[in-house]
Design a protein with these regions (language model features):
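Catalytic His-Asp segment of secreted/periplasmic serine-dependent ester chemistry enzymes
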Residues: 151-252
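Short acidic/His/Gly/Ser-rich catalytic and metal-binding motifs that mark active-site loops
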Residues: 16-20, 59-62, 99-104, 154-163, ...
């Protein structure tokens, strides 16, 4: 008898979807790569993948709010609508758009202020993240949920005004936003450890931020702008694969 394949579902925003990493797959309005970390992970595990990630998504777009795609008339239903109830593994990377993380950094670096909504506080973000996790757990109670942090954009090798058009003070500011996102992830997994865990991608990728010898994100000199590149997606998939294998051995 053939062994049943693992069922993986991936939800989230652009750091899961992989805009500007070829090949871009349909629906193109999702700006989703066939080589994002969910696809690479599914290949490693020989698993069935339901990739529901959409670039630009907020946490509310995962659970309750439809999402309008820019430059398109495509409307995405809340991602949870297509979450299979028999999922074994769920990955989530989201929350940055709720605090204007990347959009605010790009706007600042370009010197072109964007009309952005007021960001959430850390408590509000952690509460919203926790609510998303709870809804996913209700929909797929047998799944292990991995809350996958964002790859680091700014790190110890990032040189002000060279690797990114931001001065030291603004780099410190945006590093603080990244830290806020990390703290919200930590808070969200508290009391949910029986079925959910945080994957500390930010810390593990600080040595591969802008200005490093092997950056896992694109900068202003090429690649996906302040987003994961292919090397970054491969790194996240590798880290997740190792974590899942460790968890599987612990269950034997």
């Amino acid at each position: 008898m053939d062994q049943k394949k693992l069922c993986i579902a991936s939800l989230g925003s652009s750091f899961a979807a992989g805009p500007d990493i070829p090949p871009q797959i349909k629906p193109l309005a999702a700006m989703r790569s066939g080589q994002n970390y969910p696809h690479l992970l599914a290949q490693r595990l020989n698993a069935e993948l339901n990739d529901l990630s959409v670039s630009g998504a907020t946490l509310l777009n995962i659970t309750v709010e439809p999402q309008s795609a820019p430059f398109s008339d495509h409307i995405f239903l809340p991602q949870i609508s297509d979450l299979p109830s028999n999922a074994d593994i769920i990955t989530v990377t989201a929350g940055g758009n709720d605090i204007n993380y990347i959009g605010g950094m790009i706007s600042d670096a370009c010197g072109a202020p964007m009309q952005l909504p007021d960001p959430l506080t850390i408590d509000q973000l952690a509460q919203r993240l926790g609510g998303v996790l709870d809804e996913l757990h209700k929909r797929a109670p047998g799944a292990r949920i991995y809350l996958v942090e964002y790859l680091a954009i700014l790190g110890p090798d990032t040189r002000p005004d060279q690797d990114i058009p931001l001065g030291r003070e603004r780099i410190t500011h945006h590093s603080g936003i990244a830290s806020l996102l990390q703290r919200a992830y930590l808070a969200a997994v508290e009391r949910r450890g029986d079925w959910c865990e945080r994957v500390p991608i930010h810390e593990l990728s600080l040595g591969h931020a802008l200005g490093s010898k092997e950056p896992w994100v694109g900068g202003f000199d090429g690649g996906p702008l302040l987003h994961p590149n292919l090397a970054g997606m491969k790194a996240v998939a590798d880290i997740l694969y190792e974590r899942i294998c460790i968890n599987s051995k612990a269950l034997l």
